[in-house]
Amino acid sequence: MEPQSQSMTLEVPLSLGRYHISEEYGFLLPNPLEALPDHYKPWMEIALRLPHLIENRQLRAHVYRMPLLDCRFLKSYREQRLAHMALAAITMGFVWQEGEGQPQKVLPRSLAIPFVEVSRNLGLPPILVHSDLVLTNWTKRNPEGPLEISNLETIISFPGGESLRGFILVTVLVEKAAVPGLKALVQGMEAIRQHSQDTLLEALQQLRLSIQDITRALAQMHDYVDPDIFYSVIRIFLSGWKDNPAMPVGLVYEGVATEPLKYSGGSAAQSSVLHAFDEFLGIEHCKESVGFLHRMRDYMPPSHKAFLEDLHVAPSLRDYILASGPGDCLMAYNQCVEALGELRSYHINVVARYIISAATRARSRGLTNPSPHALEDRGTGGTAMLSFLKSVREKTMEALLCPGA
């Protein structure tokens, strides 16, 4: 079972595998399961039919008929991850089936009780998170084939058709593009420990290339995702019930708590990738941004959060480079920071196209329902998007070191 959220004791040399991070797939769960034991057939029968059930306004009726199942037959970590993804997806569909104007405010006990139990076992919140939608939600059509869009499929889906498929799978490719960067990060930490300038330079160069590959992977969003479908159809199913005007008091998890609970919706900030790069490069964000970013770490698998916490207390790359003086490593460090700033600028452009511009078009067409207008200027995670993203980018660029430092 996955370790809980406290940071592990930092051991050297740093090892990705110790934090359930794959040498081949990074934070992606390698070869996710697609089926649960037969006992959980009622869950999977609903989860695998979500687009049809939601579009035909039948999901809530199916959930109300769903039996209360015991979670003890979920034996493995991978089964727990699939169960969490299935129950999370059913929950999002159940809450938002009728759009933001008529959210369901009470989650039935047959869904709420097992969902909360599985969530506690995994150290995750009982809501759809990045590790559900992306890290656990992919499979290869040809197991021997490459990890690329044409050979990938999602396991669980929502309304949105090919655009939703593209949104999820392009994000899978973004996670995969980060793998060489994660390896470089570990190599760089060891180089600092060994005082090896040559190895550190090689690691920084590889990190820069990985960040640039992430930007190129993200650019595929424009090829596979229609902005109007993302905004008007998909986005509501990623929305949470914290800092959301459509659900100001939260969601009641029947049989778990009498008071409503509040959880943030999906957010790119729930991906551990840029958190890891920020920690390694020593990039410090403003107080408001740090508060949100660190809260999003509670929405990550605990071992991934522990990895970030251990990076934070590891020897400082910036201090090492500053102590070493001007040279190739300082130049390579700055190139990594610049590449990360460019990635964040590109992400701002993507957000502007898929949310800001799409919201304007939806208003001009008079689409008041089902477009999530209460969320127009906020991310599905509950942040004021553009101001947050621009602040994060600005603080990234402020990390550049003067060659004469």
UniProtKB/Swiss-Prot annotation:
InterPro entries: Indolamine_dOase (IPR000898), Trp/Indoleamine_2_3_dOase-like (IPR037217). Catalyzes the first and rate-limiting step in the kynurenine pathway of tryptophan catabolism. Involved in immune regulation. Binds 1 heme group per subunit. It comes from Mus musculus. The lineage of its organism: Eukaryota, Metazoa, Chordata, Craniata, Vertebrata. One of its GO terms (biological process) is immune system process. This is Indoleamine 2,3-dioxygenase 2. Heme binds at residue 347. Pathway: Amino-acid degradation; L-tryptophan degradation via kynurenine pathway; L-kynurenine from L-tryptophan: step 1/2. Expressed mainly in antigen-presenting immune cells, liver, kidney, brain, and placenta. Highly expressed in kidney, followed by epididymis and liver (at protein level). Detected in the tails of the spermatozoa in the testis and in the kidney tubules (at protein level). Constitutively expressed in brain.
